[in-house]
Structures are given as C-alpha cells and as structure tokens.
Design a protein with these regions (language model features):
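N-terminal Rossmann NAD(P)H-binding glycine-rich loop of SDR-like oxidoreductase domains
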Residues: 1-18
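Rossmann-fold cofactor-recognition segment
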Residues: 35-46, 64-66
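NAD(P)-cofactor binding segment of oxidoreductase domains
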Residues: 55-105, 115-123
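Conserved beta-loop-beta element that borders a ligand/cofactor-binding pocket
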Residues: 121-143
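Substrate-binding strand-loop-helix patch
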Residues: 143, 171-178, 198-218, 251, ...
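Substrate-positioning beta->alpha
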Residues: 147-152, 165-188, 195-196
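C-terminal amphipathic/interface module of NAD(P)-dependent oxidoreductases
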Residues: 246-301
C-alpha cells in the first residue's frame, strides 16, 4: 500500500533486491520499476480497493495507512498475509515523558494525531495477524515531502534569520529513509521480528541547535555565520509543528531492540542525514519560492 513516494521507493528497491515479486496499490501516477505490478486507486475508495478482492499475498506492506480502518479495509479484501503484515507506524504514538529515551513499552498517547497507528498495532495483535511494525521519529532523506530538513535549508540558503525554540537544547531525533527501508526489508528475513514493534531512527538524538548547525554544514555554510533568533515556545502546543518544523519537546527513542533483534544498525547519523538530503534532493531542486511568513509570529522577522 503505497510504494511510489518517500518511504516506498527505497523499500521497493530493497525488496526487489531480495527477489520478491511486488504489487503496488497507489493513487500516484509515478512510474514503477520494471517487473512491478501497479494497481492504481485511492485506498479510501471502496470500489478502487475492491481491485484487491480475491488476491492473496505472502506479505502486505502498509506504508500509507494512518487509521485502523485503513488497514482493516485492506485485509477484509485480501485476507491476512501468509508471512507478515509490515507496518509503518510512528514514534508520534508515544505520550510525553519525564524520562528519555522512550522504548517500545513506553505509554501511548490516545489523543495523538498518530493514535490510529497504535490502534492498528493493537488490532494486528488481537487478530493474530503476523506483523512487524516500525515506529520512526522524523524520517528524512531524498524525496521527503514533509518540510523538515527543507525548512532549515530554505532559511540557510536565503540568509534568513532562523527561529530557535528556547535555548536550543531540546533533543530531537531524525532517521534516514534508506535506513528505515533497510530495516523493514531485513525484518522479513528474521523470524524473531514476527509480532514485534521497533523504534527505528538514528542511533543518537541531537539538539535543535545541533540539527541547525548540521543543516548549515550540509549547505556549505559555517554554523557561526547563522543568525539564530531564540523564541519562547512555552505558549505553543509542544506537539504542534506550526512555525517550527519539529515538535517543541524532547523526542528521542531507544533503538536497541531493532539493532539487537535484526542485527542491524543505522548507517546515517543526524549530520550524515542532513548532508545526504541536501546533496541528493535540495541542491538538485531548491524551493522555488520559500514561504517565510510563519517566522514573523515566532521572531518578528
């Protein structure tokens, strides 16, 4: 489900390398690799989804489902996969905490905008459907349609002042899309990953200021040349991303389970994530007309 955009592209590439035969159900019109079957349709459209009726799959990969119903409607038509239901969840399911990093047993937030992903994981468990679920923090890398690293690159390359929440020491966590795809593909070959949930991001967190400096280095700019403008985030919803592209509280997960059970470790740290994203994405297609209007509410610029 999905497969032609951000997470899907590197995952499709790895699954093909493993020798899988793939069928993509996507509403996009982007070309698919040779030998890959494409079914076009919107997963929210019953008639479009009915194209899957009677089809049986060894593995179902759901990289685009956000609610429990999204995934249920697929399985209602195909039946449970014989090997694994591979799910892209989110570390956004976790509740706030006074202790960090968060592990996979940390409490969930029923009010989170990602709550549907947690509900889907619970449903897969209850139904006895063999599954593996991944909970990334911020996924970055080439093709990212969420304005995470691009938000910083826009301001740095246009010599704009950069809003900085508080003193810049809040810790966040990014992970490269290719690391996530590699871990997901590997999980299909590891029996121990069945019915497991994994945090999956870079190994270490990074402060807001550290991430901005990493973005500057990616752009070929000296971090000390940046015009950082602190603002008070206390009046804002800490989980909102209005004005600043990251939630305004700590956001850090423990990835030791996925490293241990999949014998896998991420190749990209935060610095490498930003450099790779700039070189393979932003430098090739800079934002044509960046919108800096949201900065005024934060720093008056």
């Amino acid at each position: 489900m999905g497969g032609t955009r951000f997470v899907g592209k590197p995952l499709v590439s790895r699954l093909l390398q493993q020798g899988h035969s793939l069928t993509l159900f996507t509403r996009g019109r982007q070309p698919v690799p040779d030998g890959v079957e494409a079914i076009n349709g919107d997963r929210g459209d019953d008639q479009a989804l009915d194209q899957l009726k009677g089809r049986a799959f060894d593995v179902i990969v759901d990289s685009s489902g956000r609610t429990l119903k999204d995934s249920q409607r697929v399985v209602e038509r195909t039946g449970a996969p014989s090997h694994r239901f591979l799910y892209v969840s989110s570390a956004g399911v976790y509740a706030g905490s006074e202790t960090w990093p968060l592990d996979e047993d940390s409490p969930l937030d029923p009010a989170s905008r990602h709550a549907g992903k947690g509900e889907t994981e619970q449903w897969l468990m209850r139904e006895g459907i063999a599954f593996t679920s991944f909970r990334p923090t911020y996924i970055v890398g080439p093709g990212n349609y969420n304005p995470v690293e691009r938000w910083f690159f826009d301001r740095i390359t246009h010599d704009r002042p950069i809003p900085l929440p508080g003193d810049g020491t809040t810790i966040t966590q990014v992970g490269h899309v290719e690391d996530l795809a590699e871990a997901m593909a590997r999980s299909l070959e590891v029996d121990a990953s069945c019915n497991r949930i994994y945090n999956c991001s870079a190994k270490k967190g990074i402060t807001f200021q550290g991430l901005i400096e990493a973005a500057a280095l990616a752009c070929g700019r000296a971090p000390e040349s940046l015009d950082l403008r602190p603002f008070d985030p206390s009046a804002l919803d800490p989980k909102a991303r209005k004005g600043f592209p990251l939630r305004l509280n700590h956001f850090l997960t423990d990835i030791s389970r996925v490293e241990r059970e999949l014998a896998w470790t991420p190749r990209f740290d935060a610095l490498a994530c930003m450099a790779n994203s700039y070189q393979r994405d932003y430098a090739l297609a800079p934002t044509s007309a960046p919108d800096f209007s949201g900065d005024e509410a934060l720093i008056g610029a």
